[in-house]
């Protein structure tokens, strides 16, 4: 049997897998167990009572976290004219049309979010096989296809989380860094859950938010007592 690391022993000793933790207790424990040399991301996994195989039960959208996500987000925008200048002024790192598409086709992918104005989708549509598998294809449901590219850029820079229910009805997302104050992580999680509740499909029956689990990059998953959240 492989020897357990000091971190693994601490997790085994302090984590009760059968327990639901209040959000405050969960964050405190994750902070206590975080001893790596980088700022771990705090991730949330939410099990929804949906069947994502049914077209009327897809859950997809975006939430702007009130305290950001602690990441330096690089943005590419497909647009032209005055919109292009406005996107640059808002902080977008890459702005263009056909020339930007050519760079992406050539393998230049140094960005985290892609935004497009509606008139640019004729160009972006050619990149589906490149952007789609990476989860970067602009979509109106996530606010990344919009005539208001300035707001979209600002939201992306502010730490907007895009979510989409995967197989099994599970949503994954980062809600900040372990170095964040507990109240900031709590309010970020509450913002995400609030938007998920608004996105509940009408055909979804029974319990919608089945399980909420909080974890860090290298840490354990802790099931959250949803009554400890103000949503």
Curated annotation (Swiss-Prot):
SUPFAM superfamilies: Ribosomal protein L1. GO terms for cellular component: cytosolic large ribosomal subunit. PROSITE patterns: RIBOSOMAL_L1. InterPro entries: Ribosom_uL1_bac-type, Ribosomal_uL1, Ribosomal_uL1-like, Ribosomal_uL1/biogenesis, Ribosomal_uL1_3-a/b-sand, Ribosomal_uL1_CS. Keywords: Repressor, Ribonucleoprotein, Ribosomal protein, RNA-binding, rRNA-binding, Translation regulation, tRNA-binding. One of its GO terms (molecular function) is tRNA binding. GO terms for biological process: regulation of translation; translation. Part of the 50S ribosomal subunit. PANTHER family: 54S RIBOSOMAL PROTEIN L1, MITOCHONDRIAL (PTHR36427), LARGE RIBOSOMAL SUBUNIT PROTEIN UL1M (PTHR36427:SF3). HAMAP family: Ribosomal_uL1_B. This is Large ribosomal subunit protein uL1. It comes from Cellvibrio japonicus (strain Ueda107) (Pseudomonas fluorescens subsp. cellulosa). The lineage of its organism: Bacteria, Pseudomonadati, Pseudomonadota, Gammaproteobacteria, Cellvibrionales. The gene is rplA.
């Amino acid at each position: 049997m492989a020897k357990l690391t000091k971190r693994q022993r601490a997790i085994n000793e302090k984590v009760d897998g059968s327990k639901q933790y209040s959000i405050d207790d969960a964050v405190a424990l994750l902070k206590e167990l975080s001893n790596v040399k980088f700022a771990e991301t705090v991730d949330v996994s939410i099990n929804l009572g949906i069947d994502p195989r049914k077209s009327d039960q897809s859950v997809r959208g975006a939430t702007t976290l009130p305290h950001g996500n602690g990441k330096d987000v690089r943005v590419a925008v497909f647009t032209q004219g005055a919109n292009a200048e406005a996107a640059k002024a808002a902080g977008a790192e890459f702005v263009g049309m056909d020339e930007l598409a050519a760079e992406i086709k050539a393998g230049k992918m140094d960005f985290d979010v892609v935004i497009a104005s509606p008139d640019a989708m004729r160009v972006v549509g050619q990149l589906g096989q490149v952007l789609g598998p990476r989860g970067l294809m602009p979509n109106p449901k996530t606010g990344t296809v919009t005539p208001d590219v300035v707001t979209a850029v600002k939201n992306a820079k502010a730490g907007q989380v895009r979510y989409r229910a995967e197989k099994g009805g599970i949503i994954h997302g980062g809600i900040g860094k372990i170095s964040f104050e507990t109240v900031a992580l709590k309010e970020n999680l509450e913002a995400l859950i609030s938007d998920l509740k608004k996105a509940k499909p009408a055909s979804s029956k029974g319990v919608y938010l089945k399980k909420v689990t909080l974890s860090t990059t290298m840490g354990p998953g802790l099931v959250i007592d949803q009554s400890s959240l103000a949503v």
